Amino acid sequence: MERIKELRNLMSQSRTREILTKTTVDHMAIIKKYTSGRQEKNPSLRMKWMMAMKYPITADKRITEMVPERNEQGQTLWSKMSDAGSDRVMVSPLAVTWWNRNGPVTSTVHYPKVYKTYFDKVERLKHGTFGPVHFRNQVKIRRRVDINPGHADLSAKEAQDVIMEVVFPNEVGARILTSESQLTITKEKKEELQDCKISPLMVAYMLERELVRKTRFLPVAGGTSSVYIEVLHLTQGTCWEQMYTPGGEVRNDDIDQSLIIAARNIVRRAAVSADPLASLLEMCHSTQIGGTRMVDILRQNPTEEQAVDICKAAMGLRISSSFSFGGFTFKRTSGSSIKREEEVLTGNLQTLKIRVHEGYEEFTMVGKRATAILRKATRRLVQLIVSGRDEQSIAEAIIVAMVFSQEDCMIKAVRGDLNFVNRANQRLNPMHQLLRHFQKDAKVLFQNWGIEHIDNVMGMVGVLPDMTPSTEMSMRGIRVSKMGVDEYSSTERVVVSIDRFLRVRDQRGNVLLSPEEVSETHGTERLTITYSSSMMWEINGPESVLVNTYQWIIRNWETVKIQWSQNPTMLYNKMEFEPFQSLVPKAIRGQYSGFVRTLFQQMRDVLGTFDTTQIIKLLPFAAAPPKQSRMQFSSLTVNVRGSGMRILVRGNSPVFNYNKTTKRLTILGKDAGTLIEDPDESTSGVESAVLRGFLILGKEDRRYGPALSINELSNLAKGEKANVLIGQGDVVLVMKRKRDSSILTDSQTATKRIRMAIN
């Protein structure tokens, strides 16, 4: 206030005003400051000063032919003086106004296409809803967030190649467009931007916004998807927040969200299979998200989440060096430790073998709803400063930190036995045993931890064992803070290795991730996830398993048919029949299998009993380990729709219905595809027509390899011999004719020869 009075006083003296407005600036340092270098030192002042002049703009000479010298009001629009140092004309801002009102109009068709990201943003804001403003303390933490909605996920290099190809197709320089997305985008954009008059540089900038993910490290206290980040300045201040619902989704957020769901489902499923790593890879390679291959998304998408990172590690991609424990991301900020095996006794006198970290270390812990700074020594928590959205979230963070500290009082707080198992029914490792135990009930842990008197520190309060805040006392070493802890900002990625059980380690051998760390939360994906792998059939329940199993048999019928007659055991062991077993009542699985296998053997032995529909219908039942018994069945039970439903051994049922006239198969009323029966089942002797051009030599001869299906015969060279599977599961040896002339007689002789060869 005093300063302002003093300044007012000075300004009231006429001499002061004169000095400030009239005297020249002749101090060399000042002149140097404002005249050296190309960088404008005071842009806003320069702009105001320029615009105060009569002709602040320079333009190409052609302007004098396109714009009149004076406007309707008689004001001069351009000066006859040319600009010093260039052959351009000096122009008044009024000329711009004249041009905007009266200048030529070009086509506007390309604007929405080039400035797509802006048009889309306007639509989202138009349809978005802003709710009330709440005043409260905002716990913001810096997170790496995506700042431009609606982008594809190309790398900078890939995008550069696409932009060059679209905007400057005639420029020299090698451009390699390899990925599917690059080619699709290039084709689409070239068509959209035909005859586009917008400056190529502008088009290039806008394309970059559409193609590349841009991230910033920003303080956020709420939604982190890009449609929330674009309105960050409207939704959260230092002491207020405004509720907001976006007026539309964007594909990049949908992909991130769906990728996490797919990865979680796949890791959970792989963990319970015989070879988790192989299963995980098989599923990643055969899954599509919104029509794009999951492996392509994983290669490009920087989302960091436990399940996603396990999938990336399995594919040999680099991931972040932070590790995960109890759903929190830990990043060591200082210190170091060595690992040593140690045996400890729980409060229940159970022996646990834990890997103790010896040494002083500091970590940041970042979770979905709480963050913390942890300082620990060997088996001792030195200090934990935690902040979170609510009491529950803060408690979660405290439990994780206490377990992670490996303190003795934590291990002694265990009541009862530790025998938690994972989805595959294997015992969890000791650290996760402890974690699960205290996540169920942490009362004893908090009671036994110990409390201490605390000093009054700004922004920090103590917390008592019952989670109430206090300014005098607190659990030992633990404080709650108003300020959040920032996420780890570095985008550095490290090489990791993964073992058969999906444990991911860094090059020092520290475990960064394991399936135990994968969240059990189930969400609904925003994009369609198509799991082609049979391991994921059960994700949509028993009906889906039933339909998928039969669809698989129909799709692969040609090869299935050959295996059925040649190598049934190999067929029965196919992993595609695994999910089906869960539908068959456990007590009778073995008997069903034995019965069906015997039935199939009879079909192979007795001529003319081959029945396509029946084989397809019963095949999945033969996959279980068979029990030999004399039992005969007229129907087999499957558990779907919450009860046992019957599949008739002979004939149709609601579960399995084949319509002979339309050739359509319906499973539980759902269409499962077209089934082409073998020709001989309806009319005998049709193979003879199919085998025209081949000479039948006699019975199957194993030296000529496995039996081919009739469709595969066309690949044979003239004179080449092969075994071929004909109609009723019979195999004969044939030779492709060397001359075409004798083809006509094949039909008559084939029928006789087939009968001879078989009998």
Swiss-Prot record:
Stored Gene3D superfamilies: Polymerase Basic Protein 2, C-terminal domain
A Pfam entry, by short name: Flu_PB2_7th
Residues the record marks as site: Mammalian adaptation: 627
UniProt-recorded Gene Ontology molecular function terms: RNA binding; RNA-directed RNA polymerase activity
Annotated GO CC locations: host cell mitochondrion; host cell nucleus; virion component
Superkingdom of origin organism: Viruses
Listed GO biological process terms: 7-methylguanosine mRNA capping; cap snatching; DNA-templated transcription; symbiont-mediated suppression of host cytoplasmic pattern recognition receptor signaling pathway via inhibition of MAVS activity; symbiont-mediated suppression of host gene expression; symbiont-mediated suppression of host mRNA transcription via inhibition of RNA polymerase II activity; viral RNA genome replication
InterPro entries: Flu_PB2_2nd, Flu_PB2_6th, Flu_PB2_C, Flu_PB2_CAP-bd, Flu_PB2_middle, Flu_PB2_N, INV_PB2, PB2_helical
Position of sequence motif Nuclear localization signal: 736-739
Keywords: Cap snatching, Eukaryotic host gene expression shutoff by virus, Eukaryotic host transcription shutoff by virus, Host gene expression shutoff by virus, Host mitochondrion, Host nucleus, Host-virus interaction, Inhibition of host innate immune response by virus, Inhibition of host MAVS by virus, Inhibition of host RLR pathway by virus, Inhibition of host RNA polymerase II by virus, mRNA capping, mRNA processing, Viral immunoevasion, Viral transcription, Virion
Compartments it resides in: Virion; Host nucleus; Host mitochondrion
Assembly: Influenza RNA polymerase is composed of three subunits: PB1, PB2 and PA. Interacts (via N-terminus) with PB1 (via C-terminus). Interacts with nucleoprotein NP (via N-terminus). Interacts (via N-terminus) with host MAVS (via N-terminus); this interaction inhibits host innate immune response.
Stated family: Belongs to the influenza viruses PB2 family.
Described purpose of this protein according to its UniProt entry: Plays an essential role in transcription initiation and cap-stealing mechanism, in which cellular capped pre-mRNAs are used to generate primers for viral transcription. Recognizes and binds the 7-methylguanosine-containing cap of the target pre-RNA which is subsequently cleaved after 10-13 nucleotides by the viral protein PA. Plays a role in the initiation of the viral genome replication and modulates the activity of the ribonucleoprotein (RNP) complex.
Protein name as annotated: Polymerase basic protein 2
Organism: Influenza A virus (strain A/Memphis/110/1976 H3N2)
Encoding gene per record: PB2
